[in-house]
Amino acid sequence: MQDRESRLCFRATNRIVRPFEWGLEWTREWPTTQVYPKNGHDPESYIRLLNEAGVENSDAFFEYEPPSDFRLDGNILRFTSAVHTPYPENNVVHGQWFPAKENPGAKRVAAIVLPHWNASREQHNALCKGMARLGISTLRISLPYHDFRMPGELERADYAVSANIGRTIDATRQAVIDVRSCADWLESQGYCRIGLVGTSLGSCYAYLASAHDDRFEVNVYNHCSTYFADVVWIGLSTQHIRQGLETTIDLDRLRQAWRVISPPSYSDKYAEKRKRSLFIYARYDTTFPPHLSEQVIQNARETNIDHAVVALPCGHYTLGEWPWKFIDGYHICSFLKRNL
């Protein structure tokens, strides 16, 4: 299984080792920066200060002005992201819309699907169509720097996760805010219950969004893990990023530098909300190592989160192959159908 995972992982030959950067220019628009302007701090101590302040007042860190320019063109929803970046393509959020057939008198439910890192615009669409056939209208969002939103200079979504500390935080903050903005649109269309389905990187984004938004009552985390830094440092598919990072920083310091975008920072906050959660992980995952997934589940037990667990005997990449992708899809769809 691990040999198969390695072959699937490294069939991509366009990974680039990019240099380490603190990326302080990406912090300028953060709410924490307005409260704590840089004043003689060295880059690392300033990033840590912004992380501490962001975690302490995370509602403000992930706060946003709801978009006012939602427009649905056929099956594509577009709106301007509340987070501005130097890349015009990335500043326009795209969502592919899969509406369910309306049944008079039935409650209107919807879900937002957050794909994996480097997903193409077609990936996850089959899942969305299946959910729509089950009566769950589904919006598949393009993550920051992905597919429709990818700057022309890129072949991969390298700016979403990279050895640039500030830019990675900014992309994550943008993803969380974009997802919450999608919920604003769904509410405006009359949907009374909204679920989230996040896969891999999308799972991290989904958890952060749900921890800060009561509207996401039903959540599926398809591949789950703990600290953002640990996955990047240990995971097979991010070893090129680690090569850039480890010239300057070690894992313990990286955890602190990315604390504000790490799910464990908000586990108590998540547990306080009324959520129903499904955690799916792969026993032979070399990208989201199983011991990290099991820590997530242990924390869910300790904090009394209403949750279910599915452990599949495959790996991260093989989950996208027959028969695992169909088994995975069954668990996702049936959980949403029962709980939304």
Model-derived segments and their meaning:
Residues 234-292:
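The feature captures the conserved acid-bearing segment of alpha/beta-hydrolase catalytic domains
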Residues 1-82:
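N-terminal targeting or regulatory segments adjacent to alpha/beta-hydrolase or S9 domains
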Residues 113-173:
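Cap/lid segment of the alpha/beta-hydrolase catalytic domain
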Residues 198-203, 282:
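Conserved alpha/beta-hydrolase "nucleophile elbow" surrounding the catalytic nucleophile
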Residues 205-253:
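Hydrolase active-site cap/lid region
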Residues 187-200:
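Alpha/beta-hydrolase fold nucleophile elbow
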Residues 87-93, 99-111, 133, 273-274:
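Proline/glycine-enriched tight loop/beta-turn segments at coil->beta junctions
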Residues 294, 298-340:
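C-terminal catalytic histidine-bearing segment of alpha/beta-hydrolase fold enzymes
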